[in-house]
Amino acid sequence: MKIDILTLFPEMFAPLEHSIVGKAKEKGLLDIHYHNFRDYAEKARHVDDEPYGGGQGMLLRAQPIFDTIEQIEVKKPRIILLDPAGKPFTQAYAEELALEEELIFICGHYEGYDERIKTLVTDEISLGDFVLTGGELAAMTIVDATVRLIPQVLGKESSHQDDSFSSGLLEYPQYTRPYDYRGMTVPDVLMSGHHERIRLWRLEESLRKTYLRRPDLLERYDFSEEERKLLDKIKEALG
Protein backbone atom coordinates (compact mmCIF):
# COMPACT_ATOMS: atom_id res chain seq x y z
CA MET A 1 0.00 0.00 0.00
CA LYS A 2 1.14 3.54 -0.77
CA ILE A 3 0.00 6.37 1.50
CA ASP A 4 0.59 10.09 0.95
CA ILE A 5 -0.29 12.58 3.67
CA LEU A 6 -0.72 16.32 3.07
CA THR A 7 0.04 18.26 6.24
CA LEU A 8 1.55 21.46 7.57
CA PHE A 9 3.22 19.46 10.35
CA PRO A 10 5.03 16.37 8.97
CA GLU A 11 6.95 16.02 12.23
CA MET A 12 3.72 15.09 14.03
CA PHE A 13 3.74 11.72 12.27
CA ALA A 14 6.91 10.41 13.93
CA PRO A 15 4.91 7.83 15.98
CA LEU A 16 4.01 6.05 12.74
CA GLU A 17 7.65 5.00 12.43
CA HIS A 18 7.10 2.60 15.32
CA SER A 19 4.90 -0.36 16.27
CA ILE A 20 2.70 -2.02 13.63
CA VAL A 21 2.91 0.74 11.00
CA GLY A 22 6.70 0.88 11.34
CA LYS A 23 6.92 -2.91 10.98
CA ALA A 24 4.72 -2.77 7.86
CA LYS A 25 7.23 -0.33 6.34
CA GLU A 26 10.15 -2.58 7.29
CA LYS A 27 8.45 -5.55 5.62
CA GLY A 28 7.94 -3.55 2.43
CA LEU A 29 4.16 -3.74 2.76
CA LEU A 30 3.73 0.01 3.21
CA ASP A 31 5.22 3.04 1.50
CA ILE A 32 4.29 6.29 3.25
CA HIS A 33 5.22 9.88 2.34
CA TYR A 34 4.49 13.26 3.92
CA HIS A 35 3.98 16.44 1.90
CA ASN A 36 4.07 19.89 3.49
CA PHE A 37 1.63 21.73 1.26
CA ARG A 38 3.07 25.07 2.36
CA ASP A 39 5.95 24.24 0.01
CA TYR A 40 3.50 24.47 -2.90
CA ALA A 41 1.72 27.65 -1.83
CA GLU A 42 1.81 30.78 -3.94
CA LYS A 43 1.35 34.26 -2.41
CA ALA A 44 4.40 34.21 -0.12
CA ARG A 45 3.69 30.61 1.01
CA HIS A 46 0.32 31.55 2.50
CA VAL A 47 -1.94 28.50 2.75
CA ASP A 48 -4.97 30.25 4.27
CA ASP A 49 -7.09 33.32 3.64
CA GLU A 50 -10.23 35.09 4.84
CA PRO A 51 -13.61 33.65 3.81
CA TYR A 52 -15.68 35.44 1.18
CA GLY A 53 -18.83 36.87 2.75
CA GLY A 54 -17.11 37.36 6.08
CA GLY A 55 -17.01 35.11 9.10
CA GLN A 56 -14.73 33.91 11.84
CA GLY A 57 -11.33 32.34 11.24
CA MET A 58 -9.32 31.54 8.14
CA LEU A 59 -9.92 28.96 5.41
CA LEU A 60 -7.43 26.61 3.80
CA ARG A 61 -6.87 27.77 0.22
CA ALA A 62 -7.50 25.41 -2.69
CA GLN A 63 -4.33 26.14 -4.68
CA PRO A 64 -1.73 24.55 -2.37
CA ILE A 65 -3.81 21.38 -2.03
CA PHE A 66 -4.45 21.02 -5.76
CA ASP A 67 -0.80 21.61 -6.65
CA THR A 68 0.47 19.17 -4.01
CA ILE A 69 -1.82 16.36 -5.10
CA GLU A 70 -1.04 16.92 -8.78
CA GLN A 71 2.66 16.24 -8.20
CA ILE A 72 2.06 12.94 -6.36
CA GLU A 73 2.61 9.94 -8.63
CA VAL A 74 -0.49 7.81 -8.16
CA LYS A 75 -2.99 6.10 -10.44
CA LYS A 76 -6.41 5.85 -8.81
CA PRO A 77 -6.08 6.85 -5.16
CA ARG A 78 -8.77 7.21 -2.54
CA ILE A 79 -8.39 10.85 -1.49
CA ILE A 80 -9.53 11.34 2.09
CA LEU A 81 -10.38 14.68 3.65
CA LEU A 82 -10.37 14.70 7.46
CA ASP A 83 -13.44 16.71 8.41
CA PRO A 84 -15.66 16.69 11.54
CA ALA A 85 -18.64 16.88 9.18
CA GLY A 86 -17.54 13.72 7.35
CA LYS A 87 -18.76 10.13 7.50
CA PRO A 88 -17.99 8.45 10.86
CA PHE A 89 -14.95 6.17 10.77
CA THR A 90 -15.64 2.57 11.78
CA GLN A 91 -13.89 -0.80 11.76
CA ALA A 92 -15.81 -1.67 8.60
CA TYR A 93 -14.48 1.51 6.98
CA ALA A 94 -10.92 0.49 7.95
CA GLU A 95 -11.47 -2.92 6.38
CA GLU A 96 -12.63 -1.23 3.18
CA LEU A 97 -9.62 1.10 3.03
CA ALA A 98 -7.23 -1.80 3.68
CA LEU A 99 -8.18 -3.22 0.27
CA GLU A 100 -6.93 -0.10 -1.53
CA GLU A 101 -3.48 0.26 -3.10
CA GLU A 102 -3.19 4.04 -2.81
CA LEU A 103 -4.52 6.45 -0.18
CA ILE A 104 -4.06 10.21 0.11
CA PHE A 105 -4.98 12.05 3.32
CA ILE A 106 -5.57 15.81 3.49
CA CYS A 107 -5.02 17.22 6.99
CA GLY A 108 -6.54 20.64 7.44
CA HIS A 109 -6.07 23.39 9.98
CA TYR A 110 -7.76 26.72 10.59
CA GLU A 111 -11.53 27.24 10.45
CA GLY A 112 -12.13 24.98 7.48
CA TYR A 113 -11.55 24.37 3.79
CA ASP A 114 -12.28 26.21 0.58
CA GLU A 115 -15.21 24.13 -0.69
CA ARG A 116 -13.49 23.61 -4.06
CA ILE A 117 -10.94 21.32 -2.40
CA LYS A 118 -13.73 18.79 -2.01
CA THR A 119 -13.91 18.32 -5.80
CA LEU A 120 -10.67 16.33 -5.46
CA VAL A 121 -11.94 14.16 -2.63
CA THR A 122 -13.44 10.65 -2.70
CA ASP A 123 -14.07 10.39 1.05
CA GLU A 124 -14.77 12.84 3.87
CA ILE A 125 -14.12 11.11 7.21
CA SER A 126 -14.73 12.10 10.82
CA LEU A 127 -13.54 10.34 13.98
CA GLY A 128 -16.61 11.46 15.89
CA ASP A 129 -18.74 14.32 17.11
CA PHE A 130 -15.90 16.52 18.31
CA VAL A 131 -13.41 18.96 16.79
CA LEU A 132 -9.62 18.59 16.74
CA THR A 133 -7.08 21.35 16.14
CA GLY A 134 -6.08 19.72 12.86
CA GLY A 135 -6.45 16.55 10.85
CA GLU A 136 -3.12 14.99 11.80
CA LEU A 137 -4.29 12.96 14.80
CA ALA A 138 -7.30 11.74 12.84
CA ALA A 139 -5.09 10.70 9.92
CA MET A 140 -2.72 8.79 12.22
CA THR A 141 -5.66 6.97 13.80
CA ILE A 142 -7.10 5.95 10.44
CA VAL A 143 -3.70 4.90 9.07
CA ASP A 144 -3.03 2.72 12.13
CA ALA A 145 -6.48 1.11 12.05
CA THR A 146 -6.16 0.44 8.30
CA VAL A 147 -2.56 -0.73 7.98
CA ARG A 148 -2.89 -3.41 10.66
CA LEU A 149 -5.55 -5.07 8.46
CA ILE A 150 -3.24 -5.43 5.45
CA PRO A 151 -2.42 -9.13 4.92
CA GLN A 152 0.90 -10.20 6.50
CA VAL A 153 1.23 -7.04 8.62
CA LEU A 154 0.17 -8.80 11.83
CA GLY A 155 1.87 -11.99 12.93
CA LYS A 156 -1.22 -14.14 12.30
CA GLU A 157 -3.90 -13.48 9.72
CA SER A 158 -6.52 -14.16 12.41
CA SER A 159 -5.00 -11.71 14.91
CA HIS A 160 -7.47 -8.94 14.16
CA GLN A 161 -10.57 -11.06 13.57
CA ASP A 162 -11.52 -11.20 17.24
CA ASP A 163 -10.93 -7.47 17.81
CA SER A 164 -13.83 -5.43 19.09
CA PHE A 165 -16.10 -4.40 16.19
CA SER A 166 -14.54 -6.84 13.67
CA SER A 167 -17.31 -9.34 14.39
CA GLY A 168 -19.88 -6.65 15.13
CA LEU A 169 -19.55 -7.27 18.89
CA LEU A 170 -17.19 -5.97 21.56
CA GLU A 171 -14.33 -8.30 22.40
CA TYR A 172 -14.60 -10.80 25.26
CA PRO A 173 -12.40 -10.48 28.40
CA GLN A 174 -8.92 -11.99 28.20
CA TYR A 175 -6.39 -13.15 30.81
CA THR A 176 -2.74 -14.22 30.99
CA ARG A 177 -0.39 -15.52 33.71
CA PRO A 178 -0.51 -15.73 36.68
CA TYR A 179 -3.72 -17.61 37.37
CA ASP A 180 -4.21 -15.81 40.71
CA TYR A 181 -3.20 -12.17 41.04
CA ARG A 182 -4.08 -10.44 44.32
CA GLY A 183 -7.04 -12.74 44.79
CA MET A 184 -8.35 -12.17 41.26
CA THR A 185 -8.44 -15.52 39.46
CA VAL A 186 -8.87 -16.53 35.84
CA PRO A 187 -12.34 -17.99 35.05
CA ASP A 188 -12.16 -21.77 35.40
CA VAL A 189 -13.63 -22.36 31.95
CA LEU A 190 -10.51 -20.86 30.37
CA MET A 191 -8.36 -23.37 32.27
CA SER A 192 -10.51 -26.34 31.27
CA GLY A 193 -9.02 -27.01 27.84
CA HIS A 194 -12.57 -27.64 26.58
CA HIS A 195 -12.64 -25.71 23.32
CA GLU A 196 -16.41 -25.67 22.86
CA ARG A 197 -17.07 -24.45 26.40
CA ILE A 198 -14.42 -21.74 25.93
CA ARG A 199 -16.01 -20.69 22.63
CA LEU A 200 -19.45 -20.40 24.22
CA TRP A 201 -18.08 -18.49 27.22
CA ARG A 202 -16.31 -16.00 24.96
CA LEU A 203 -19.39 -15.53 22.81
CA GLU A 204 -21.60 -14.99 25.86
CA GLU A 205 -19.15 -12.49 27.36
CA SER A 206 -18.93 -10.59 24.05
CA LEU A 207 -22.70 -10.36 23.92
CA ARG A 208 -22.88 -9.31 27.58
CA LYS A 209 -20.28 -6.55 27.18
CA THR A 210 -21.91 -5.27 23.99
CA TYR A 211 -25.39 -5.30 25.56
CA LEU A 212 -24.18 -3.34 28.60
CA ARG A 213 -21.81 -0.88 26.90
CA ARG A 214 -22.87 -0.54 23.26
CA PRO A 215 -26.47 -1.73 22.84
CA ASP A 216 -26.67 0.35 19.66
CA LEU A 217 -24.40 -2.21 17.95
CA LEU A 218 -26.95 -4.95 18.59
CA GLU A 219 -29.65 -3.03 16.75
CA ARG A 220 -27.94 -3.78 13.43
CA TYR A 221 -26.31 -7.09 14.36
CA ASP A 222 -27.32 -10.22 12.43
CA PHE A 223 -27.90 -12.76 15.22
CA SER A 224 -27.59 -16.50 14.84
CA GLU A 225 -30.12 -18.62 16.72
CA GLU A 226 -27.41 -19.51 19.25
CA GLU A 227 -26.52 -15.86 19.83
CA ARG A 228 -30.16 -14.87 20.24
CA LYS A 229 -30.65 -17.52 22.94
CA LEU A 230 -27.50 -16.42 24.76
CA LEU A 231 -28.60 -12.78 24.69
CA ASP A 232 -32.02 -13.72 26.06
CA LYS A 233 -30.25 -15.60 28.86
CA ILE A 234 -28.11 -12.53 29.62
CA LYS A 235 -31.11 -10.20 29.72
CA GLU A 236 -33.00 -12.56 32.02
CA ALA A 237 -30.03 -12.82 34.40
CA LEU A 238 -29.61 -9.05 34.51
CA GLY A 239 -33.29 -8.53 35.13
Curated annotation (Swiss-Prot):
Specifically methylates guanosine-37 in various tRNAs. GO terms for cellular component: cytosol. It is an enzyme of class 2 (transferase). GO terms for biological process: tRNA N1-guanine methylation. The keyword Methyltransferase applies. Homodimer. The keyword S-adenosyl-L-methionine applies. GO terms for molecular function: tRNA (guanine(37)-N1)-methyltransferase activity. Its EC number is 2.1.1.228. It catalyses: guanosine(37) in tRNA + S-adenosyl-L-methionine = N(1)-methylguanosine(37) in tRNA + S-adenosyl-L-homocysteine + H(+). Pfam families: tRNA_m1G_MT. Keywords: Cytoplasm, Methyltransferase, S-adenosyl-L-methionine, Transferase, tRNA processing. S-adenosyl-L-methionine binds at residues 108, 127-132. SUPFAM superfamilies: alpha/beta knot. This is tRNA (guanine-N(1)-)-methyltransferase. It comes from Streptococcus pyogenes serotype M18 (strain MGAS8232). InterPro entries: Alpha/beta_knot_MTases (IPR029028), tRNA_m1G_MeTrfase_C_sf (IPR023148), tRNA_m1G_MeTrfase_TrmD (IPR002649), tRNA_m1G_MTases_N (IPR029026), tRNA_MeTrfase_TRMD/TRM10 (IPR016009). Gene3D superfamilies: 3.40.1280.10, tRNA(m1g37)methyltransferase, domain 2. Belongs to the RNA methyltransferase TrmD family. It is found in: Cytoplasm.
